[in-house]
Amino acid sequence: MDELLLQDPEVGKAIILEIERQTGKLELIASENFVSAAVRQAQGSVLTHKYAEGYPGKRYYGGCEFVDIAENIAIERARTIFGCEYANVQPHSGSQANMGVYFACLKPGDTILGMNLSHGGHLTHGSPVNFSGRLFNVVFYGVEKETGRIDYEQVAALAREHKPSLIVAGASAYPRTIDFARFRAIADEVGAKLMVDMAHIAGLVAAGYHPSPVQHAHYTTTTTHKTLRGPRGGMILSTEDNGKTLNSQIFPGIQGGPLMHVIAAKAVAFGEALRPAFKEYQKQVVDNAAALAGVLTAAGFDLVSGGTDNHLMLVDLTSKDVTGKDAEIALDKAGITVNKNTVPFETRSPFVTSGVRLGTPALTTRGMKAAEMEKVGGWIVDAIANTTNETRLAEISREVERFARQFPLFAW
């Protein structure tokens, strides 16, 4: 940081402030995590200098023999982790991985059956404000009002009625195990392809703590951060027979040069995911989520679906007469970072919401376990009970900071 602070103190100070925020606060945003020093070193390496349009062994630039090594390592490790024939590690994000799949198997105007964003889906699963909702005809399924779980009967009925070309499974705010085999059976019945977006649960899948979609889906996409604990980026997994088309849709279809420094960092993270400690880490993520959910439930909070099977929980604050926006602000003042989130059958604007989403990957990476979740849960309950009590929120913030600074950002 010395050289950066000397050359550009404005940017350098912003980074230092962010280090302080991450170190002194509790990160409970379910889609965020902390990476190892090795991953950061790969991402900050001289590979950022290199243009490498194309794929290993078939580039449009010279001098790619060493970045080819890095990309091939990433591909082979991804295939080993997830037991698949094909992996494309070039997508810059999960959204671009999804776009690559859509362009590989759909034409503009084709029908997609995806999960409603307010029920836990994702923007790229057909939201009208996203490219997926602009280019394609989208039909949405959701969760059952009584259980908060995916309504598979509704999925099947909508599939039979609308005959989608593609069914999209996967979510950004769904706390329960997804039945990928059932989705595939529905897709086969109506002649649709199945894409699973496992961005949130990829790390759990890699470690065996969530059933894998790879054997059921025609296409599987993911981010490489979140529970997979790598750099921010995307990836597509499939069978070898889909490889040529998928490759061409990523490059030259929607991207130019791949980010070779990020791909190298992906390779490092995938190497970490193949180690025994990664499986232990993922178990702790799930155990911590269950412990935190237990604290909140005992305090009278309503969790969508009644709990969690994975790394996240969705807290419906309707009965507490607190909006998601107000809860997010109060928790931030208390040193706890979350995001406001819509809940199924939402009545408020997405800028206000009735819920917050909480996740345990980042705190688990710092070395926290179930005992620490008891403390964290207590602070969450206290802060939400005192959203307008600035004095108490400041007191909680001081307690949180003293606690948080006992843990490194990366303990695994």
From Swiss-Prot:
(6S)-5,6,7,8-tetrahydrofolate binds at L117, G121, H122, L123, S349, P350, F351. One of its GO terms (molecular function) is glycine hydroxymethyltransferase activity. The record marks H225 as: Plays an important role in substrate specificity. One of its GO terms (cellular component) is cytosol. The modification N6-(pyridoxal phosphate)lysine is found at K226. CDD domains: SHMT. It holds the Pfam family SHMT. Keywords: Amino-acid biosynthesis, Cytoplasm, One-carbon metabolism, Pyridoxal phosphate, Transferase. GO terms for biological process: glycine biosynthetic process from serine; tetrahydrofolate interconversion. The keyword Amino-acid biosynthesis applies. It catalyses: (6R)-5,10-methylene-5,6,7,8-tetrahydrofolate + glycine + H2O = (6S)-5,6,7,8-tetrahydrofolate + L-serine. The keyword Cytoplasm applies. It is found in: Cytoplasm. InterPro entries: PyrdxlP-dep_Trfase, PyrdxlP-dep_Trfase_major, PyrdxlP-dep_Trfase_small, Ser_HO-MeTrfase, Ser_HO-MeTrfase-like, Ser_HO-MeTrfase_PLP_BS, SHMT-like_dom. Its main location: cytoplasm. Its EC number is 2.1.2.1. PROSITE patterns: SHMT. Its cofactor is pyridoxal 5'-phosphate. It comes from the Bacteria. Gene3D superfamilies: Aspartate Aminotransferase, domain 1, Type I PLP-dependent aspartate aminotransferase-like (Major domain). Catalyzes the reversible interconversion of serine and glycine with tetrahydrofolate (THF) serving as the one-carbon carrier. This reaction serves as the major source of one-carbon groups required for the biosynthesis of purines, thymidylate, methionine, and other important biomolecules. Also exhibits THF-independent aldolase activity toward beta-hydroxyamino acids, producing glycine and aldehydes, via a retro-aldol mechanism. PANTHER family: SERINE HYDROXYMETHYLTRANSFERASE. Homodimer. This is Serine hydroxymethyltransferase.
